[in-house]
Every structure is written in C-alpha cells, then in structure tokens.
Amino acid sequence: MIQTFNELGALREQIAQWKREGLRVALVPTMGNLHGGHHSLVTLARQYADKVVASIFVNPTQFGPNEDFSRYPRTPEADVAGLEQVGCDAVWLPSVEAMYPLGVDKTTQMHAPGVSEVLEGASRPGHFDGVCTVVARLFLQVQPDVAVFGRKDYQQLAVIRQMVAELSFPIQIVGADIVRDEDGLAKSSRNQYLSAEQRPVATTIHRTLLGMREGYVAGQARDRIEADATAALQAAGFQVDYAVLRTPELAEPTFDGGGRVALIAARLGSTRLIDNLEF
C-alpha cells in the first residue's frame, strides 16, 4: 500500500530506514494533476531504484504574475490513487509553509545562469529560478539516489542537470521520453484547458516539429526552417513564443551537422503549450 507523507520528519524517517536496508531511492517531482506521462516517470524510476517517492507540490515561485497558479488543478486524491496503481511507494505532499517557511516572497532563491535565461526563461522571467529553488529543496528533503524528469520540459531538464553538476548533488538525473496521445499531442496537464474545437488544432505543434526535422535533414537553412514553422503555427491560429532549432545544449548552432532539438512554445487561445523533438 502506498504511503503518504505531509510531515517532513516522518518522510525522512522512512527514507532513512530504506537506506539502512541498502535500498536505492528515486524521486519523481510533480505538481500533481497527474496523467499517463507522469505515470511513465514512475515506471521508469522503478528501473533505477528499489523505492520510488513522488512529490506533489504546486510551486508558486515558478509561476509568473499573469500565469495560472490559482487556476492550476489540484487533484491529490486521484493523483495518489493513480500513483499507487503504477507502483509508487510513497507520496510527499508538502504545504507551501513547509516548503517556504520564511514565506514565498522572502525565500532564498536559486539561479542557474545561461541555460535558464533563453527560450522559456526569456518568455517567463524567473520561472527557472523557481524550478531550481523547489527542486533543490526536494533533493535535500528526500535525498534520492536518482531523480526522473520528463523530456517534454527539455529546457527544465537541462537547467536541473546544470544545477546538479555545479552543486555536486550526488544524484543521478534521468530524462524520460515524451508520452504522446495517438494523434501526436504531448500529454500535458494543460491539455484539459483546450476546447473541443482547439484539441485537434493543437496537434499542429507535433506536425510542425516533424516538419522542422524534415527541413534539417533536407539541408534547409535554420532561418528558413524556423520561419516556416512559425508561419505554419500562426496559420493554424497559434500565438507563437518561439519555434527554434538548437543544439542539445540549447545553444544556437554555429555549424551544420550534429544533433539538434526543435523546440516550440505557442499559445492556442489562453492555453500555452510546449513541445520538442530531438534528432
């Protein structure tokens, strides 16, 4: 039976017991409102550890002033039930007061320079400071041997890898493949905001990513690939934040050849969607 923890001392006591038994512990950080993509992270975590802890915390410090913090769905009972079905061992459900005892406005903030300041960081100033701040605290609270993050948030994974390397966290970071619906739309908690009319239009993002890959393989110039992608999204009704090709490290490519990642962030109505494709 899955264990739920609302108090840090009890969670740490359980984790200490597991470690005394020589068991490896994995952490899957989430903001709740879980779907099949989140469940796949737990399944992957079980390949790397004996015990899996999922955290559920809607983190206020990673939402901007005009973003959907208050609107973000809170479904803890359904989340815990779903986690139990996929073999999660424990769920950590901290309060805002437990995570930020000095208050959200007075808390010590983390910052990962460089990779956190482009793309999502430019569109959502301060977002990755909030991500780093909460993830570092979760690492200190749970002290996992491994942590699993989805590749759908490609830049977030890169930021966390940088933070872990720089601060020498003794934690293995694992990136999980994107889980998609049959029509290609990446699973996301924000998909539920899409209307019945918008839902099929949203698949344009994945088709556009595939087109960007085709353009790159065909030898098209990066500027043309990005311009064509932006135009395709706008024609479908999106407001585009970015549609870009980058190196795996998120730098602007300076030469042909090598791996690439295509990244898109675009708004359909009031719903902002992100996706990416590595090739």
Swiss-Prot record:
Pathway entry:
Cofactor biosynthesis; (R)-pantothenate biosynthesis; (R)-pantothenate from (R)-pantoate and beta-alanine: step 1/1
Root EC class: ligase
Family matches, as Pfam families? Pantoate_ligase
Give the EC number(s) under which this enzyme is classified. 6.3.2.1
Q: Subcellular localization, per the record?
A: Cytoplasm
GO BP, one example?
pantothenate biosynthetic process
Described by its record, this protein's role is as follows: Catalyzes the condensation of pantoate with beta-alanine in an ATP-dependent reaction via a pantoyl-adenylate intermediate.
What assembly does the database describe for this protein? Homodimer.
- The identity of this protein, by name, is Pantothenate synthetase
Species per Swiss-Prot/TrEMBL record: Stenotrophomonas maltophilia (strain K279a)
Organism phylogeny: Bacteria, Pseudomonadati, Pseudomonadota, Gammaproteobacteria, Lysobacterales
